[in-house]
């Protein structure tokens, strides 16, 4: 019978409650261990055999069991006889020294046993007031054990006798570190014992295991998350993590590695996303890596989060995701879109979402095409990649990010003056909703479905309220009034200021600022011809009016000063007009040729007050004066204040002034020639690199909206997955409460040269009705189409059954409640029975599906427009 069996046989309730018995038994075990240690100490050449090793490990395990019995039995923290023996004899230190001298074949066995001993000390400590890890005779050997496992942050530690798989000792070591981190959460004071002298061994040792396979990697990630959550308020630990470790780099590098293992093609039709069985684990690893990255960003110190966001952008988005979208393989591009969409829908931490938005709006290809325009370009084609592109764009829309919507939708609408403020005011009227709602319901084909309008009224109201709440903190309302630097043109002067709730219309987004003289003529203080002083006398300027005007300036809309000379000839009144209708009236004097030439001289005498001074009018257009008589006549009407100077003094003043002006003009011309020569030399060296948008280079139309309208127009030719994703995109886009978008999407336009949604739907309806009349038993095709849609919906629900429940899960409408990303893994692909279709059968099937989808779309749009006056 082994000694362990003997120990178990002697176990009794009396033994369990007798500390003296513990001490006696401990002494016996220690004598055995001490003798084994002494043999190696006396004779360094002594070779330890297997039985000798097992005897030491077994007795050490029993000694630690007795130690934990003593520690847990004490009501208050105190050092008992057994713990004191560990301290005075330095038992753990001596055992580590002995084990390091073992042969390689025995060292791994001893290493694993020591890890289990420490795991027992950590996990079996049930006393809240006395954790043995605070004692140096216990803590220092633990640190030495960590050094034993120390290795590079990225590469595995692999000895000659080991392969690259995680060993059993490493698995137990990660479990030990995880339990230590759990103790840190239970007692935060322990953090000071493990983080000292700018060293955090427990955290550093976890980094190489972050992306290990199986439970080992999950335990390491959980442990790191626990550490960073406990130290979220500790700046010194945050600095250590970002500056002294490679944690942030490994985090994003591992994410990139998970992405590189994903399949280069996705099964299914683009709406149904399936992967081969061999890639299931890789997809699960990628999803877990995204969740871990997001969880770290939500719990860690702000400095750590900022560092992670930086590497997430540079190391993952721009170096991995972006190149995948620039390949020539459309299958791989479509798969990459699915993976990016999974990233967008998984990550919710604002800084990481901001990084994704930054890539969408600023990254360009070699031809200068912005990333989101690249995605939009893949919509054309109607294949699987087109379907995934529509779904990815829909995920952009669901972000409800003002910058994204400004780039994709609002910027082209605002800069191309899609509507006046008077036209947009119609959006607020309830009568518009009833009229337009009926117009969209009239677009339902004659062969349409039984009306489910009440369901759409309920679901759209919920989503419109949620979308309005998402947009509540946007900077601008995009209603043609508070549109910032893109104020829409007014139909009249009175209309220019209608619905203005603040005194000055200006923009914090504008690229041009007239401060501090933005509300005066030009960039200089106001000049009143009534205050002309005597010739040769300095003018006494009165800044009272200017100060009053400056006091009226709305500080919320003041822009930083800029150097107007940088704009050169680009800064013309016609371009400034896009900034603000009121600002335009004040800054038109910036260009002298435009302001002076545009208005002739006006000389008006007062007809209502004969006592008014002669200079009660404003003169302009002095460049039009070509004869001396007119010039004298104008001067005679001015009142000159002060005493008249002698003619000699006046002539001297004129000559002096003329000479100074002539000299200044010569110097100016010489300087301009010199600057021109320098610019010609410097110009080849200059290279302007810009990201994002120019303040002048705007597209004529929104590429996204244009693509959507083109897709609706070809509804009968498109495949079912494409039409479904397209209508889902329209459904999400139409819920935005901004008046300019609502007007563009829903209201009919007088301009017949441009396509509009309502007219397109009417055209598609007419086409479907005509085609339906020529198809025999079209009602049967409608029933088959409904069965196909139901079967497809069942497959998608089956794929998404294990995914987190969402608010859209029980929505019975067609364009809401879908899950674009299935959980990792592949489910059986069920298909309805099919046969060799003739060309006529394909046409009939597509027409029936188009009729069903159009019926749902019209009901959805009618429900939205009917409630816009209540939401907007």
UniProtKB/Swiss-Prot annotation:
Positions with biased composition (Basic and acidic residues): 829-841
UniProt xrefs under Pfam families: DUF5917, RAI16-like
Coiled coil stretches, renumbered: none
UniProt region (Disordered), positions on chain: 800-841
Signal peptide: none
Top-level taxonomic group: Eukaryota
InterPro entries: FHIP (IPR019384), FHIP_C (IPR045669)
UniProt record similarity statement: Belongs to the FHIP family.
Descriptive protein name: FHIP family protein CBG19667
């Amino acid at each position: 019978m082994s000694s362990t069996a003997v120990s178990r046989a002697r176990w009794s309730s009396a033994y369990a409650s007798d500390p003296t018995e513990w001490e006696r038994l401990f002494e016996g075990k220690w004598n055995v261990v001490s003798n084994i240690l002494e043999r190696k100490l006396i004779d360094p050449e002594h070779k330890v055999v297997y039985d000798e090793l097992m005897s030491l490990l077994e007795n050490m395990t029993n000694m630690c069991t007795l130690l934990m019995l003593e520690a847990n039995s004490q009501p208050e923290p105190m050092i008992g006889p057994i713990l004191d023996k560990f301290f005075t004899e330095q038992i753990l230190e001596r055992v580590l020294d002995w084990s390091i001298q073992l042969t390689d074949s025995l060292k791994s066995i001893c290493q694993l046993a020591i890890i289990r001993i420490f795991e027992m000390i950590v996990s079996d400590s049930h006393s809240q007031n006395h954790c043995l890890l605070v004692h140096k005779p216990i803590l220092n050997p633990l640190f030495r054990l960590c050094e034993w496992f120390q290795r590079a942050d990225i590469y595995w530690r692999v000895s000659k006798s080991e392969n690259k798989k995680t060993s059993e000792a490493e698995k137990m070591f990660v479990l030990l570190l995880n339990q230590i981190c759990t103790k840190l959460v239970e007692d935060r004071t322990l953090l000071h014992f493990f983080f000292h002298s700018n060293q955090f061994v427990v955290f550093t040792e976890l980094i190489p295991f972050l992306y290990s396979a199986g439970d080992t990697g999950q335990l390491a990630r959980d442990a790191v998350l626990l550490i960073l959550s406990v130290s979220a308020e500790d700046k010194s630990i945050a600095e250590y993590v970002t500056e002294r470790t490679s944690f942030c780099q490994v985090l994003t590098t591992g994410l990139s590695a998970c992405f590189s293992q994903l399949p280069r093609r996705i099964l299914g039709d683009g709406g149904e996303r399936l992967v081969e069985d061999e890639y299931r684990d890789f997809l699960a690893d990628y999803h877990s890596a995204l969740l871990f990255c997001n969880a770290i960003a939500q719990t860690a110190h702000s400095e750590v989060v900022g560092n992670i966001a930086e590497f997430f952008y540079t190391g993952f988005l721009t170096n991995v995701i972006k190149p995948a979208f620039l390949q020539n393989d459309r299958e791989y591009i479509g798969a990459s879109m699915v993976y990016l969409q999974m990233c967008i829908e998984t990550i919710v931490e604002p800084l990481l979402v901001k990084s994704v938005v930054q890539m969408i709006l600023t990254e360009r290809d070699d031809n200068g095409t912005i990333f989101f325009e690249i995605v939009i370009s893949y919509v054309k084609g109607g294949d699987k990649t087109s379907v995934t592109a529509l779904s990815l764009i829909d995920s952009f829309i669901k972000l409800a990010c003002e910058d994204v919507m400004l780039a994709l939708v609002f910027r082209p609408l605002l800069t191309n003056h899609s509507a006046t403020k008077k036209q947009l005011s119609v959006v607020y009227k309830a009568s518009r909703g009833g009229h337009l709602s009926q117009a969209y319901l009239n677009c339902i084909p004659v062969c349409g479905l039984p009306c489910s309008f009440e369901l759409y009224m309920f679901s759209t109201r919920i989503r419109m309220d949620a979308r309005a709440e998402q947009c509540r903190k946007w900077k601008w309302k995009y209603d043609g009034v508070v549109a910032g630097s893109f104020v829409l043109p007014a139909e009249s002067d009175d209309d220019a200021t209608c619905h203005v709730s603040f005194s000055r219309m200006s923009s914090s987004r504008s690229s041009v600022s007239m401060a501090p003289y933005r509300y005066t003529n030009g960039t200089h203080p106001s000049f009143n011809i009534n205050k002309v002083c005597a010739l040769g006398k300095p003018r006494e300027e009165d800044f009272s009016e200017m100060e009053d005007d400056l006091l009226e300036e709305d500080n919320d809309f003041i822009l930083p000063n800029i150097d107007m000379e940088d704009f050169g000839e680009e800064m013309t009144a016609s371009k400034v007009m896009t900034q603000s209708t009121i600002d335009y009236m004040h800054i038109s004097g910036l260009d002298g040729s435009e302001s002076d030439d545009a208005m002739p001289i006006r000389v008006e005498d007062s007809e209502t007050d004969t006592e008014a001074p002669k200079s009660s009018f404003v003169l302009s257009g002095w460049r039009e004066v070509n004869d001396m008589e007119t010039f004298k006549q104008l001067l005679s009407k001015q009142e000159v204040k002060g005493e008249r100077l002698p003619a000699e003094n006046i002539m001297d003043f004129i000559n002096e002034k003329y000479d100074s002006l002539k000299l200044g003009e010569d110097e100016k011309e010489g300087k301009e020639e010199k600057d021109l020569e320098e610019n010609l030399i410097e110009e080849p060296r200059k290279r302007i690199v810009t990201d994002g948008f120019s303040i002048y280079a705007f597209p004529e139309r929104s590429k996204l909206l244009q693509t959507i309208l083109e897709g609706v127009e070809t509804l009968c030719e498109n495949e079912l997955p494409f039409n479904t994703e397209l209508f889902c995109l329209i459904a999400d886009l139409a819920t935005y409460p901004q008046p300019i978008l609502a007007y563009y999407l829903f209201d009919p336009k007088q301009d017949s040269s441009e396509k509009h949604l309502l007219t397109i739907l009417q055209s598609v309806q007419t086409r479907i009705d005509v085609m339906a009349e020529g198809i025999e038993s079209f009602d049967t095709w409608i029933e088959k189409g409904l069965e196909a849609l139901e079967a497809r919906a069942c497959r998608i629900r089956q794929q998404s059954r294990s995914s987190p429940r969402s608010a859209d899960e029980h929505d019975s409408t067609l364009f809401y409640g879908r899950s674009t990303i299935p959980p990792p893994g592949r489910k059986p692909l069920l298909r309805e029975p099919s046969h060799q279709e003739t060309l006529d059968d394909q046409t009939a099937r597509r027409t029936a599906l188009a009729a069903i989808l159009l019926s749902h779309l019209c009901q959805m749009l009618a429900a939205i427009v009917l409630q816009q006056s209540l939401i907007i």
